[in-house]
């Protein structure tokens, strides 16, 4: 019998990367067909989802939960017959019902669902060989970062860190008097450029009318419908996020208002693990295989 693992997406991009790495390892270890399901209101839009941006290599996969027979017994049971249920804030209210640990040996259901929150392990040294940008995404990001110098430090100015500790701003200016600026907050960018006019801003910044009560909110977590009403294209925003991630990953030095920002720390870690070059490499051609369930199939790209 074919067995499956659904990896839901929630929270920020680097939470998702960690969870994707976790799910890839589980799928390989337990011989399961993987579906990374990022069809939630934070990431997906206009029929675009995880597989619109990334190719998987070396792990069997399907691209939608609709390719999994819905009648199969599922663990946790909350997802039974409802694999397409969107991840959202409700996950935190039902942690006990969605908890998933593959090492618990008493779970033999054909379908497992990892909720996208909670405990996970990740291996970024392997991840860049298991996940690749789709060719059209790689080409677009390459274009977006082509004119960004690689010899300057990067400064990450996250809107949610506006209330920075005393002296932190001055520390950043001393560490990177001229820098590449990655930010989601227009007010922080304006402040930085006032102090460092020769710095280069690469990010589209947070529109002021999306910032509630003077506090920046991550644009990547803003509902695509809200963004659309503000004239912000979600696909462009996702591309910008990926480009910013690569810019920080490849920088010789990088600094942040909050070094504990997961986007900042994981981009640096990804770069240190040698991921920047390989993730741009085209994935091998996917082969299509039939499953034991009539009318169902999965895909597989052989590792080089």
Which positions does each model-derived feature cover?
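Short beta-strand/turn micro-motifs composed of small residues
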Residues: 38, 157, 181-183, 255-258
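Short, aromatic/basic amphipathic alpha-helical patches
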Residues: 47-58, 188-198, 266-269
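C-terminal structured domain segments
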Residues: 218-236, 240-243, 254, 258-259
């Amino acid at each position: 019998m074919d067995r499956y693992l659904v990896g839901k997406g929630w929270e920020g991009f680097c939470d998702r990367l960690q969870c994707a790495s976790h799910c890839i390892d589980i799928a390989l270890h337990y011989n399961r067909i993987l579906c990374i399901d990022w069809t939630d209101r934070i990431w997906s839009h206009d029929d675009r989802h995880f597989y619109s941006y990334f190719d998987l290599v070396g792990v069997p996969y399907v691209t939608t939960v609709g390719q999994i027979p819905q009648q199969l017994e599922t663990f946790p049971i909350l997802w039974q017959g409802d694999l397409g249920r969107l991840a959202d804030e409700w996950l935190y209210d039902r942690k006990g019902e969605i908890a998933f640990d593959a090492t618990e040996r008493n779970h033999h259901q054909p379908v497992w669902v990892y909720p996208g929150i909670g405990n996970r392990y990740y291996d970024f040294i392997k991840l860049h060989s298991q996940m690749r940008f789709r060719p059209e995404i790689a080409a677009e990001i390459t274009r977006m970062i082509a004119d960004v110098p690689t010899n300057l430090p990067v400064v990450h100015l996250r809107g949610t860190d506006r209330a920075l500790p005393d002296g932190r701003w001055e520390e950043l200016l001393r560490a990177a008097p001229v820098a590449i600026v990655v930010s989601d907050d227009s007010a922080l960018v304006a402040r930085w450029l006032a102090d460092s006019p020769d710095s280069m801003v690469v990010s589209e910044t947070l529109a002021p009318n999306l910032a509630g009560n003077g506090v920046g909110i991550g644009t990547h977590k803003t509902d695509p419908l809200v963004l659309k009403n503000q004239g912000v294209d979600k696909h462009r925003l996702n591309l910008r996020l990926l480009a910013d991630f690569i810019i920080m990953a490849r920088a010789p030095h990088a600094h942040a208002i909050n070094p504990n920002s997961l986007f900042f720390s994981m981009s640096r870690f990804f770069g240190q693990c040698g991921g920047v070059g390989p993730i741009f490499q085209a994935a091998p051609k996917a082969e299509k295989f039939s499953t034991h369930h009539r009318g169902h199939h999965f895909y597989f790209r052989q590792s080089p």
